[in-house]
């Protein structure tokens, strides 16, 4: 295999979750705390892409620190009650990658405990390392901290890893860490996102099958 370690984003890369969980959670939160604010699913996805979820909540929704904490609790409670499905074919890819001796790690904006729950619920190979939203804000994507921590923990060089993500923060992190990046384009078809990712990503997969061939062939 070309890579010894897959570093996977979680939402809309491994599991189909933004449309079914994260967006509905925000809609319900806004009904209470921002009743005059309305956002479509596509608009929400674009805002997650640029400027990113933290900046979206703080700068666009202008949540106070107290409201930000409330939204975080509201979102996590919603996530705990809803388990997303893994994309068809992902399980087989991860199983084969592990069987060949590869490492599987996660760098995500979801909580570690919820990521682990989703992997278990979908009968996926348990990741070797998981870095999630529990990290301080300055260490989350697009900061390079998680990739650097993975390389240190597993004694790997930058060219032995590949980051797989559907959004820009993962690409920025990988580029800044000198790690290869694969754009995951199989979750949705939002023009603003797919246009950027297909243009800017040297490696971009529209389907899970394309990803399988790239990683395992």
Locate each region found by the language model.
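Asp-based, Mg2+/Mn2+-dependent phosphohydrolase catalytic module
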Residues: 1-4, 112, 116-217
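Short, acidic loop-to-helix structural element flanking the phosphoryl-transfer center
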Residues: 78-106, 112-116, 144
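N-terminal helical cap/lid subdomain that shapes the substrate entry/recognition surface
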Residues: 2-92, 96
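Short helix-capping segments at alpha-helix termini
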Residues: 31-37, 100, 122-126, 155-156
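Conserved SAM-binding loop
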Residues: 14, 104, 163-164
């Amino acid at each position: 295999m070309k890579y010894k370690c897959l570093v996977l984003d979680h939402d809309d890369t491994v599991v189909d979750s933004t449309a079914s969980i994260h967006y509905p959670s925000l809609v319900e939160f806004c009904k209470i705390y921002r009743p005059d604010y309305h956002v479509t699913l596509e608009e929400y996805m674009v805002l997650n892409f640029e400027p990113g979820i933290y900046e979206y909540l703080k700068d666009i929704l202008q949540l106070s620190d107290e409201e930000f904490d409330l939204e975080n609790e509201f979102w996590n409670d919603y996530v705990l009650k809803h388990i997303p499905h893994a994309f068809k074919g992902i399980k087989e890819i991860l199983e084969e990658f592990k069987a060949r001796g590869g490492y599987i790690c996660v760098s995500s904006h979801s909580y570690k405990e919820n990521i682990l729950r989703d992997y278990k619920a979908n009968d996926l190979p348990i990741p070797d390392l998981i870095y999630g939203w529990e990290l301080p804000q300055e260490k989350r994507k697009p900061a390079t901290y998680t990739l650097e921590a993975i390389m240190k923990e597993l004694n790997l060089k930058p060219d032995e890893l590949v980051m797989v993500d559907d959004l820009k923060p993962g690409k920025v992190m990988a580029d800044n860490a000198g790690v290869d990046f694969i754009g995951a384009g199989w979750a949705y078809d939002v023009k603003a996102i797919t246009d950027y990712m297909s243009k800017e990503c040297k490696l971009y997969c529209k389907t899970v099958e394309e990803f399988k061939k790239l990683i395992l062939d």
